[in-house]
């Protein structure tokens, strides 16, 4: 199910020459590293527009589905996503960056790449991948997006929003 939760500002408001960034977010602090990158680009005098994206994975666990319907789960995920997106948009709006928010359900890497192409983004901004040992216990979306990358370049940033040397793929 594709659904747009809320549109904060028109993505095109950044102007014709604006650097259009796709910033995927979730409930982790790591996902906010790209917000700092966008703010820094803006502070450096660049015309920037940001699209925040939250992708909810489909819940298929029988332990959850035993107590909740798919519709209840979708509604909960959409409400949670809306809160996260509004919270993530706040610092960008305060920095004068036009923001659009998007909500999708399904495969995370696919939707990141798909939305970036649909919105004609110039960059997808993701946190640096976890160290190899941490990959064993976490879902490493950055590596998966890089592996499946199509036409939109991926910029990997650190905790301060600073792109890693040679990280733009």
Kindly label every feature range from the protein language model:
Residues 51-53, 100-104, 155-157:
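General small-molecule cofactor/ligand-binding pocket signal
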